[in-house]
């Protein structure tokens, strides 16, 4: 039997284990919140019973050598979406299969692939960039992020990743970010963060629903963090209270037209992450350490639920690195001497003036085709470290990663924009930064 046949049999058998329990769950969802709460306990028992059946089935007792061979072959052959959903299906079979996937399936930093939704909050690849595109809908004020599956930037050729919705307030603008294009409620477990601007649209703060690593105990006092996989979380829990980054646009006091100038302070990423041997803290070195196991905390045991978005995943936590610290309820966290480390600061790459075209130009390597004030490229800003050389002393050359474009964003058609990101940014962070470029800036242009 080929490994493709094994995977097909697993999906079919897995879907028939608890079809009755899945139907009960669907009925509960149709009846609304109050009725679904009544049936929640019954659904939980059905899911638990199905989990016990799967755990004791023949698939859970496959010889480790055979199981490893199946997963390794599948990981190598199903490298791109939509066929990569088979890897997700294997990780959803049982704990034994999930543990094997934990050993074999690596995060985007090392494999350059987005497999599980938790990958959206993990750093991008070190070698190369993950190519995405954003589709804007002005009528509904929504922005959808897709993974490019081909050279053509079309929704039909993209894998949906994230969605954002714009809300105008009296003194600010908010962009709420979700893992679903349909469920855009703040009380939903699809809600993962937001972007908030000031009145002028010159300063933005990126918020995440998950706290930095060293703030788990602080978040329980007054502000409670939510876990996406838990079905017992009240929808009235407070959301996104952790500031992880700040984006600022320089004011244009002279009123002359020109490119925007922006800076990003990534409180959750240390500047040392770009140095030789540097890493983003609280990220797994080679496997989906803890988040993958939490990703399947409330799986619906059916074939359709495995292949669709009813699989719920946890979010990876951010680092405890901060200068000024991430903010929780207006108070800085992690300000001890041990935790103080310079955050990564990104700045936009200065464009050059093209005399023949009479416009400012950047080399996007064919990924951007329409001139727009929204287009930008971000590189690491050079920061003087402690004990930096004096002006009379020659400064050492910056690390090679400081010259690389970490994030680029630009227009390709009406309401279509490309977004390419790499290490140390995650897809969530890159998407939030790009959303800031859409907002109206009264004093920057």
Curated annotation (Swiss-Prot):
Ubiquitous. It holds the Pfam family F-box-like. Residues 56-114 form the F-box domain. It comes from the Eukaryota. Belongs to the TUB family. This is Tubby-like F-box protein 14.
């Amino acid at each position: 039997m080929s490994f493709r046949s094994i995977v097909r049999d697993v999906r079919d058998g897995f879907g028939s284990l608890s079809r009755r329990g899945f139907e009960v769950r669907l009925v509960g969802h149709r009846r609304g919140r109050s009725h679904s709460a009544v049936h929640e306990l019954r659904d939980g028992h059905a899911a638990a019973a199905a989990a016990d059946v799967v755990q004791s089935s023949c698939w859970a007792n496959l010889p480790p050598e055979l199981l490893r061979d199946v997963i390794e072959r599948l990981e190598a052959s199903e490298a791109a979406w939509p066929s990569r959903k088979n890897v997700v299906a294997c990780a959803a079979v049982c704990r034994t299969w999930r543990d094997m996937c934990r050993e074999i399936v690596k995060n985007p930093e090392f494999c350059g692939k987005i497999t599980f939704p938790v990958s959206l909050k993990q750093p991008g690849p070190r070698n190369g960039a993950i190519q995405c595109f954003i589709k804007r809908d002005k009528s509904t004020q929504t922005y959808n992020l897709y993974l490019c599956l081909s050279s053509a930037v079309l929704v039909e050729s993209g894998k949906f990743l994230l969605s954002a919705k714009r809300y105008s307030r009296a003194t600010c603008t908010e962009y709420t970010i979700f893992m679903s294009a349909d469920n855009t409620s703040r009380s939903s477990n699809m809600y993962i963060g937001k972007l908030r601007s000031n009145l002028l649209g010159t300063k933005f703060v990126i918020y995440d629903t998950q706290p930095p690593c060293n703030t788990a105990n602080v978040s329980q006092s007054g502000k409670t963090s939510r876990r996406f996989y838990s079905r017992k979380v009240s929808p009235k829990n407070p959301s996104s209270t952790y500031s992880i980054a700040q984006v600022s646009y320089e004011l244009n006091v002279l009123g002359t037209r020109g490119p925007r100038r922006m800076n990003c302070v990534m409180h959750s990423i240390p500047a040392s992450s770009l140095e030789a041997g540097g890493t983003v803290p609280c990220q797994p070195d080679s496997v989906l350490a803890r988040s993958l196991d939490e990703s399947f905390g409330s799986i619906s045991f059916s074939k359709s639920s495995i292949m669709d978005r009813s699989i719920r995943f946890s979010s990876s936590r951010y680092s405890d690195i901060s200068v000024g610290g991430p903010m929780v309820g207006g108070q800085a966290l992690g300000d001890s001497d041990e935790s103080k480390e310079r955050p990564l600061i990104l700045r936009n790459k200065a464009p050059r003036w093209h005399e023949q075209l009479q416009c400012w130009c950047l080399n996007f390597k064919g990924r951007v085709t329409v001139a727009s004030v929204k287009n930008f490229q971000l590189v690491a800003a050079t920061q003087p470290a402690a004990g930096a050389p004096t002006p009379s002393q020659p400064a050492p050359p910056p690390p090679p990663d400081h010259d690389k474009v970490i994030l680029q964003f630009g227009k390709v058609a009406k309401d279509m924009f490309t977004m390419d990101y790499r290490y140390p940014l995650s897809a969530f962070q890159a998407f939030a930064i790009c959303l800031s470029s859409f907002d109206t800036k009264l004093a920057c242009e």
